[in-house]
Amino acid sequence: MGRYSGKTCRLLFMLVLTVAFFVAELVSGYLGNSIALLSDSFNMLSDLISLCVGLSAGYIARRPTRGFSATYGYARAEVVGALSNAVFLTALCFTIFVEAVLRLARPERIDDPELVLIVGVLGLLVNVVGLLIFQDCAAWFACCLRGRSRRLQQRQQLAEGCVPGAFGGPQGAEDPRRAADPTAPGSDSAVTLRGTSVERKREKGATVFANVAGDSFNTQNEPEDMMKKEKKSEALNIRGVLLHVMGDALGSVVVVITAIIFYVLPLKSEDPCNWQCYIDPSLTVLMVIIILSSAFPLIKETAAILLQMVPKGVNMEELMSKLSAVPGISSVHEVHIWELVSGKIIATLHIKYPKDRGYQDASTKIREIFHHAGIHNVTIQFENVDLKEPLEQKDLLLLCNSPCISKGCAKQLCCPPGALPLAHVNGCAEHNGGPSLDTYGSDGLSRRDAREVAIEVSLDSCLSDHGQSLNKTQEDQCYVNRTHF
């Protein structure tokens, strides 16, 4: 369709309609003295702003390149756009609610119900068109997800040599040359190979890196199961725009109902206001409540993503228990799990592991645990520990091997020493306010003894037995021997 895609053309068409009806409803609301029509016109304005924000955020988020200024790209632009739309709509609803309450205290009649009815019906039609357009966009987004899943499955089958008609099977038996040469002209597999050549080139580097890191793709060769287990990725940006359109549609319904009542049961100018005058503000308050009930969950979800909170559906306690039960792991700390965007979860963690054992097997098992939890972007930092050291030295199991080299930057750490989150340690028990590691089994990996403790360790007399603070000289000398979790 030339410069713009079909979806962009539909959105631009919706923008034009929204601008036109915003002006029409604003003028008609003042002429007809209808608070519902005025509120609906400002809902149209919010739709216009949300469309601009949604289009801009979607364009920014689709930028394919990552640079030194945006190492994660611009994927969160849609999250910011959705949050902006939801917050703006909430503020608008508050303004409308205040105006409706004032109208309840001083009710007024609708002067020209016929004009209000005509404009309200036309506005409702525009909103229905908008709902159909954005529902189509949401369906297009879901279709893209399903298409990606099918392409993953086709590439996996192609790698295993089990694509029908490409490396054997009934179609291959009909033409041996095509079976021998899957890239022969006219063969079905030739189209598949050409269609996926670019994507296979992009995945080549990741495949080599994963093989070097010791990952096993045999445990992740079921894309359909993977798509079912991971959290469903929703288009937050589209949800924000849909929320505005839905609110505007509800406002149009209120306008139509109020106008019909005044048109069927007109009030003369000399008659006092009766129950009819309360219909308009009452339905407006109900509309505000319905819109806010949909806006608050979107605000909560987008704010949780921007605050990098643990995603909903991730059981941290169960995950930590499984990680600490992996053979060879002495302790797990510095665990951070957050969402880049809805459905894309990222995890980082530090692992204490024996220095005389290779960590490839443990890395594979850890990634399997995260994979089954729906987390596929995992960064693991292994830290060596010598289990042959005396028991009094095993407090080192609780220490991070990579603290900052300077005490002055302690407050700049994501988890400063004063804030002690929970860590999992195999064979660790809490003793006198601090952990003790004298309860190891024969292999040091007894899962029954594993406990979740808040860790504050003392090393080389950095802290007294009663937790008394030290003077500045002693604290400076032993800072390099303490850390945070």
From Swiss-Prot:
Effect noted on mutating D47E: Loss of calcium:manganese antiporter activity
GO annotations of cellular component type: early endosome; early endosome membrane; Golgi apparatus; Golgi membrane; membrane; plasma membrane; recycling endosome; recycling endosome membrane
Effect of D40A: No effect on localization to the plasma membrane. Loss of calcium:manganese antiporter activity
InterPro entries the record matches: Cation_efflux (IPR002524), Cation_efflux_TMD_sf (IPR027469)
Single biological process term from Gene Ontology: zinc ion transmembrane transport
Transmembrane segments: 11-31, 41-61, 82-102, 114-134, 245-265, 279-299
MF terms (GO), sorted A to Z: calcium:manganese antiporter activity; manganese ion transmembrane transporter activity; zinc ion transmembrane transporter activity
Effect caused by changing H333A: Decreased calcium:manganese antiporter activity
Keywords: Antiport, Cell membrane, Disease variant, Dystonia, Endosome, Golgi apparatus, Ion transport, Manganese, Membrane, Neurodegeneration, Parkinsonism, Transmembrane, Transmembrane helix, Transport, Zinc, Zinc transport
Region (Required for plasma membrane localization), start-end ranges: 308-485
Topology Extracellular: residue spans: 32-40, 103-113, 266-278
Catalytic activity: Mn(2+)(out) + Ca(2+)(in) = Mn(2+)(in) + Ca(2+)(out); Zn(2+)(in) = Zn(2+)(out)
Site (Important for coupling of manganese to calcium transport): N43
Involvement in disease: Hypermanganesemia with dystonia 1: A metabolic autosomal recessive disorder characterized by dystonia, parkinsonism, extrapyramidal signs, severe hypermanganesemia, polycythemia, and chronic hepatic disease, including steatosis and cirrhosis.
Function: Calcium:manganese antiporter of the plasma membrane mediating the efflux of intracellular manganese coupled to an active extracellular calcium exchange. Required for intracellular manganese homeostasis, an essential cation for the function of several enzymes, including some crucially important for the metabolism of neurotransmitters and other neuronal metabolic pathways. Manganese can also be cytotoxic and induce oxidative stress, mitochondrial dysfunction and apoptosis.
Binding partners and assembly: Forms homodimers. Forms heterodimers and high-molecular weight oligomers with SLC30A3, SLC30A2 and SLC30A4; heterodimerization is mediated by covalent-bound tyrosine residues, occurs probably in a tissue-specific manner and could mediate the intracellular zinc transport activity into early endosomes and recycling endosomes.
UniProt cross-references to PANTHER family, sorted A to Z: CALCIUM_MANGANESE ANTIPORTER SLC30A10, FI23527P1
Protein name listed in UniProt: Calcium/manganese antiporter SLC30A10
